[in-house]
Swiss-Prot record:
Residues 1-20 form the signal peptide. Heterotetramer upon binding of the ligand. The heterotetramer is composed of an ephrin dimer and a receptor dimer. Oligomerization is probably required to induce biological responses. Forms a ternary EFNA5-EPHA3-ADAM10 complex mediating EFNA5 extracellular domain shedding by ADAM10 which regulates the EFNA5-EPHA3 complex internalization and function. Interacts with NCK1 (via SH2 domain); mediates EFNA5-EPHA3 signaling. Interacts (phosphorylated) with PTPN1; dephosphorylates EPHA3 and may regulate its trafficking and function. Changing K207N: In a pancreatic ductal adenocarcinoma sample; somatic mutation. Keywords: ATP-binding, Cell adhesion, Cell membrane, Glycoprotein, Kinase, Membrane, Nucleotide-binding, Phosphoprotein, Receptor, Repeat, Secreted, Signal, Transferase, Transmembrane, Transmembrane helix, Tyrosine-protein kinase. Autophosphorylates upon activation by EFNA5. Phosphorylation on Tyr-602 mediates interaction with NCK1. Dephosphorylated by PTPN1. Belongs to the protein kinase superfamily. Tyr protein kinase family. Ephrin receptor subfamily. Changing T933M: In a lung carcinoma sample; somatic mutation. Residues 566-983 are cytoplasmic. This is Ephrin type-A receptor 3. It comes from Homo sapiens.
Length: 983
């Protein structure tokens, strides 16, 4: 009894300290029983009645609390039970029991060594209803034996120190509606300070704008997947889900919700945009402030309303400021030239806040009373166009002479159609003069002699009055117009005498009316006879017919001879040679085979381009943007919409303003060449525009641009089969050109275009190129130089361009493709390239290049052009490789490489090098001399230790020279083993 009293005294004095530091209960724990919160007696059943005893105390707030204690340590065989009241389970699947208790150290109590215990037992029993005061021990299931981590002694009693223990045990799963807990004392001195029973749940939460409800874990093994619901004013982007763990924790958030248009995320909710702000789209972006000249007056706005006289076009984004129509154009100036006028004006002072300002020209023909006007004739032409002008100038032609016109220049932008105010325009009135005659189109040579030429021509198509006379201008071609003669003729023919024999003369003719002279005709060249023999135009035709007939008879005789030879057994005797009928070094082309016609043989380039190309109406073409600058002007992308056909994307080359006649001939000459080709691997000409300005060449649009830059951009991203497919397309296109008798002269990856389907097409059909006597030896066009790295040796040395020289170039293209656009011969100078190729050196195989493809490269680079394969053979070889992909898996090995590769210097005698500079010259890296000299690599030992990283550090960063130097170093090491080699 003294023992029990000591516990009572200790509890009553120390229970305050036990609860002095309150720890907040976690939000994921739900109490089913908490003895500290029960007011009044607990009313638990104690059996036997003299066992557990209920006592009272107070907490730190002096609130009464109830505890149980037992301390029957003097008697043997103690079996004291304490049972709680019936506890409803609610939704718990697993429960936790938290016990706070004190326990007396048996060693501190005298005379109880045989009867005192330091543990007690915890039991539970499930039931669907309350059993009242009935108590049966055998119905309870043991949970655990509870021992104290710390027990108190007699000394602690004296110091009034209470050592409180806390133990937690799990119970479950529980299935019935409720349960009892029971505590069995077997002889301990123990006091139950508090009992708490709880279960864990995942509490309500909001994550990624999705609400997840309170969730109780199902069991201890698996996670519970919970589907979330979006908060108000939001919608699912991805279905929101989270997993509830057995510890009551939310894990692995998946999916999310986003705020509706007009709402933004604030404080885990979607709240309406404030007035003056808007949000146009669903999503978790913030509300934005209304753009200039717009506002909102209510919450939750999805867009802002424009102010009065401001508008938003249908295609304008909500974030764009509201705009208004532009003001009228300013400072209109007219420059009249007979029956045409050039109108210039200044931009409006106010563009309305937009960049899409364009101008429309309204033309009115007026009587002598300016107020009486009518629309102009549809024959009036506007250059570049009448509507949608982006520049502040327009040329109007084909007006009537001596007529009053009024031109109204409208300024419009993207919101002009939405505006109710009147049109914003500036007007100018003009009166045309009498027009000069149009040019003479054609000059015909009627008769020539050694000192005279007779010419005739047609009257101009538009005389614009009575022709008074014609001015004939002529000069010797070699004089280049430095000295010329002019005479006048009243009719449409003239004989010019006192000319030099066997001399070419250039003629131009223009007509004159009361309004003045028209423009000169284009230049025509005619030659006088070398002697007194003269021949009329009609006689020359007779002679030509006779010559043609004679040639036809000869050819017919040859054909008959061949047929007789076949009949008499020629086939058996010459079977291998009968495929072609040979004439010298060439062969007879049979009827039906299409042959390339050089457009430069036409006197009039317009005639050639109209024969081979389709004339397009400029109104069917729309230009989107400028993508580059070409040889004669800008290169643009745009769209072509022909009547009854689908709109297509096109590339557009334009002839720049201020072009010369020669530039126009060359520009149209390229179209005349392209127009003759029709092949899936040749760039397709859609047509030309020559009847309005600017003059344009329109081709199909290739989305991926030039092949070399495309490959560099997608380095190592294609399979070998895909690369071979590209090469096969190029070879097929070149076979077509070769069969037509066309020599490209500039075949390189930069001149191959590739579309979105990886189809390669040959382009850049060539203007005349002149080989300079420059040691760098580059072929020159009017647009720049073409490096000789793609040019065959005979073309460099003898200006001999053939289909075989195109095959050499194809081998370089093959190397470019397999190296993903690497520059042939790297940083070698052109002079070094010429020297190396003449000495038999060839490019090495690119990394991981199939042996079959590298062998094809070497075949294309045969010095004797007759030994190179034909394009027909190249196509056949590539077809076989595509059908047999396994043959492409054999990679060119170092051992199998020929010894004449540019980067294989094993055949170079290292002992011949006296200095580092000599060595670098010998391995084609002379440009590295200063680098190595600067870092004092001057001996064999130091050279042999250089690594790739070392070269990068000293400035040799290009892969080609690195490989050459490393290859030479390996050879140097081999020779160094046999003795020192000064370098």
């Amino acid at each position: 009894m003294d023992c029990q009293l000591s516990i009572l005294l200790l509890l009553s004095c120390s229970v305050l300290d036990s609860f002095g530091e309150l720890i907040p209960q976690p939000s994921n724990e739900v109490n089913l029983l908490d003895s500290k919160t029960i007011q009044g007696e607990l009313g638990w059943i104690s059996y036997p009645s003299h066992g557990w005893e209920e006592i009272s105390g107070v907490d730190e707030h002096y609130t009464p609390i109830r505890t149980y204690q037992v301390c029957n340590v003097m008697d043997h065989s103690q079996n004291n039970w304490l049972r709680t009241n019936w506890v409803p389970r609610n939704s718990a699947q697993k429960i936790y029991v938290e016990l706070k208790f004190t326990l007396r150290d048996c060693n501190s109590i005298p005379l109880v060594l045989g009867t005192c215990k330091e543990t007690f037992n915890l039991y539970y029993m499930e039931s669907d209803d309350d059993h009242g005061v009935k108590f049966r021990e055998h119905q309870f299931t043991k949970i655990d034996t509870i021992a104290a981590d710390e027990s108190f002694t007699q000394m602690d009693l004296g110091d009034r120190i209470l050592k409180l223990n806390t133990e937690i045990r799990e119970v479950g799963p529980v299935n019935k509606k409720g349960f009892y807990l029971a505590f069995q004392d077997v002889g301990a001195c123990v006091a139950l300070v508090s009992v708490r029973v709880y279960f864990k749940k995942c509490p309500f939460t909001v994550k990624n704008l999705a609400m997840f409800p309170d969730t109780v874990p199902m069991d201890s093994q698996s996670l519970v997947e919970v589907r979330g619901s979006c908060v108000n004013n939001s919608k699912e982007e991805d279905p929101p889900r989270m997993y509830c763990s057995t510890e009551g924790e939310w894990l692995v958030p998946i999916g999310k919700c986003s705020c509706n248009a007009g709402y933004e995320e604030r404080g885990f909710m979607c709240q309406a945009c404030r007035p003056g702000f808007y949000k146009a789209l669903d999503g978790n972006m913030k509300c934005a402030k209304c753009p200039p000249h717009s506002s909102t007056q209510e919450d939750g706005s999805m867009n802002c309303r424009c102010e009065n006289n401001y508008f938003r076009a249908d295609k304008d984004p909500p974030s764009m400021a509201c705009t208004r129509p532009p003001s009228s154009p300013r400072n209109v100036i007219s420059n009249i030239n007979e029956t045409s006028v050039i109108l210039d004006w200044s931009w409006p002072l106010d563009t309305g806040g937009r960049k899409d300002v364009t101008f429309n020209i309204i033309c009115k023909k007026c009587g002598w009373n300016i107020k009486q006007c009518e629309p102009c004739s549809p024959n009036v032409r506007f250059l570049p166009r009448q509507f949608g002008l982006t520049n502040t100038t327009v040329t109007v032609t084909d007006l009537l002479a001596h007529t009053n016109y009024t031109f109204e220049i409208d300024a419009v932008n993207g919101v002009s159609e939405l505006s109710s105010p009147p049109r914003q325009f500036a007007a100018v009135s003009i009166t045309t003069n009498q027009a000069a005659p149009s040019p003479v189109l054609t000059i015909k040579k009627d008769r020539t002699s050694r000192n005279s030429i007779s010419l005739s021509w047609q009257e101009p198509e538009h005389p614009n009055g009575i022709i008074l006379d014609y001015e004939v201008k002529y000069y010797e071609k070699q004089e280049q117009e430095t000295s010329y003669t002019i005479l006048r003729a009243r009719g449409t023919n003239v004989t010019i005498s006192s000319l030099k024999p066997d001399t070419i003369y250039v003629f131009q003719i223009r007509a004159r009316t009361a309004a003045g002279y028209g423009t000169n005709s284009r230049k025509f060249e005619f030659e006088t006879s070398p002697d007194s023999f003269s021949i009329s135009g009609e006689s020359s035709q007779v002679v030509m017919i006779a010559i043609s007939a004679a040639v036809a008879i000869i050819l017919l005789t040859v054909v008959i001879y061949v047929l007789i030879g076949r009949f008499c057994g020629y086939k058996s005797k010459h079977g291998a040679d009968e495929k072609r009928l040979h004439f010298g070094n060439g062969h007879l082309k049979l009827p039906g085979l299409r042959t390339y016609v050089d457009p430069h043989t036409y006197e009039d380039p317009t005639q050639a381009v109209h024969e081979f190309a389709k004339e397009l109406d400029a109104t069917n073409i729309s230009i989107d943007k400028v993508v580059g600058a070409g040889e004669f002007g800008e290169v643009c992308s745009g769209r072509l919409k022909l009547p009854s056909k689908k709109e297509i994307s096109v590339a557009i080359k334009t002839l720049k303003v201020g072009y010369t006649e020669k530039q126009r001939r060359d520009f149209l000459g390229e179209a005349s060449i392209m127009g003759q080709f029709d092949h899936p691997n040749i760039i397709r000409l859609e047509g030309v525009v020559t009847k309005s300005k600017p003059v344009m060449i329109v081709t199909e649009y290739m989305e991926n641009g030039s092949l070399d830059s495309f490959l560099r951009k997608h380095d190592a991203q294609f399979t070998v089969i895909q690369l071979v497919g590209m090469l096969r397309g190029i070879a097929s296109g070149m076979k077509y050109l070769s069969d037509m008798g066309y020599v490209h002269r500039d075949l390189a990856a930069r001149n191959i275009l590739i579309n979105s389907n990886l189809v390669c097409k040959v382009s850049d059909f060539g203007l005349s190129r002149v080989l300079e006597d420059d040691p760098e030896a580059a072929y020159t066009t009017r647009g720049g130089k073409i490096p000789i790295r793609w040019t065959s040796p005979e073309a460099i040395a003898y200006r001999k361009f053939t289909s075989a020289s195109d095959v050499w170039s194809y081998g370089i293209v093959l190397w470019e493709v397999m190296s993903y656009g690497e520059r042939p011969y790297w940083e070698m100078s052109n002079q070094d390239v010429i020297k190396a190729v003449d000495e038999g050196y060839r490019l090495p195989p690119p990394m991981d290049c199939p042996a079959a493809l590298y062998q094809l490269m070497l075949d294309c680079w045969q010095k004797d052009r007759n030994n190179r394969p034909k394009f027909e053979q190249i196509v056949s070889i590539l077809d076989k490789l595509i059908r047999n992909p396994g043959s492409l898996k054999i990679i060119t090995s170092a051992a199998a490489r020929p010894s004449n590769l540019l980067l294989d210097q094993s055949n170079v005698d290292i002992t011949t090098f006296r200095t580092t500079g000599d060595w670098l010259n010998g391995v084609w890296t002379a440009h590295c001399k200063e680098i190595f000299t600067g870092v004092e690599y001057s001996s064999c030992d130091t050279i042999a230790k250089i690594s790739t990283d070392d070269m990068k550090k000293v400035g040799v960063t290009v892969v080609g020279p690195q490989k050459k130097i490393i290859s030479s170093i390996k050879a140097l090491e081999t020779q160094s083993k046999n003795g020192p080699v000064p370098v």
